[in-house]
Swiss-Prot record:
<feature type="modified residue" description="Pyrrolidone carboxylic acid">
    <location>
        <position position="22"/>
    </location>
</feature>
<dbReference type="Pfam" id="PF06377">
    <property type="entry name" value="Adipokin_hormo"/>
</dbReference>
<dbReference type="GO" id="GO:0005179">
    <property type="term" value="F:hormone activity"/>
</dbReference>
<keyword id="KW-0027">Amidation</keyword>
<dbReference type="GO" id="GO:0031409">
    <property type="term" value="F:pigment binding"/>
</dbReference>
<protein>
    <recommendedName>
        <fullName>Red pigment-concentrating hormone</fullName>
    </recommendedName>
</protein>
<dbReference type="InterPro" id="IPR010475">
    <property type="entry name" value="AKH/RPCH_hormone"/>
</dbReference>
<feature type="signal peptide">
    <location>
        <begin position="1"/>
        <end position="21"/>
    </location>
</feature>
<keyword id="KW-0372">Hormone</keyword>
<keyword id="KW-0732">Signal</keyword>
<feature type="modified residue" description="Tryptophan amide">
    <location>
        <position position="29"/>
    </location>
</feature>
<keyword id="KW-0608">Pigment</keyword>
<keyword id="KW-0964">Secreted</keyword>
<comment type="function">
    <text>This hormone adapts the animal to light backgrounds by stimulating concentration of the pigment of its red body-chromatophores.</text>
</comment>
<keyword id="KW-0165">Cleavage on pair of basic residues</keyword>
<comment type="similarity">
    <text>Belongs to the AKH/HRTH/RPCH family.</text>
</comment>
<dbReference type="GO" id="GO:0005576">
    <property type="term" value="C:extracellular region"/>
</dbReference>
Length: 93
């Protein structure tokens, strides 16, 4: 009887150590819609299609400097490197 309890506890601990999860919460989560069903005005109702602002539509954006794009690329690459290092430390440690 004691061995069965210990074995079950050991299996639960091994499974729990192998499982990882991530929770994401949005700012509008859990809030009820306004009386008109339009939401709070801060966020569109779920499933609603929001057209882009006129300043973003079409060709009015202009060109983006290459230096800006390269800076963003370097930031993303640095963060990806940090994530890989953290994952390696987690798996090895």
């Amino acid at each position: 009887m004691v061995r069965a309890v210990v074995a079950t506890l050991l299996v639960v601990l091994v499974v729990a150590s192998c499982v990882s999860a991530q929770l994401n919460f949005s700012p509008g989560w859990g809030k009820r819609a306004a009386a008109g069903g339009e939401g709070t005005g801060m966020h569109p109702p779920a499933g609603a299609v929001v057209p882009p602002p006129s300043s973003l539509a079409g060709e009015s954006c202009g060109t983006i400097p290459v230096t800006t794009v390269m800076h963003i690329y370097r930031l993303i690459r640095a963060e990806a490197t940090r994530l890989v290092q953290c994952q390696d430390e987690e798996y090895l440690g």
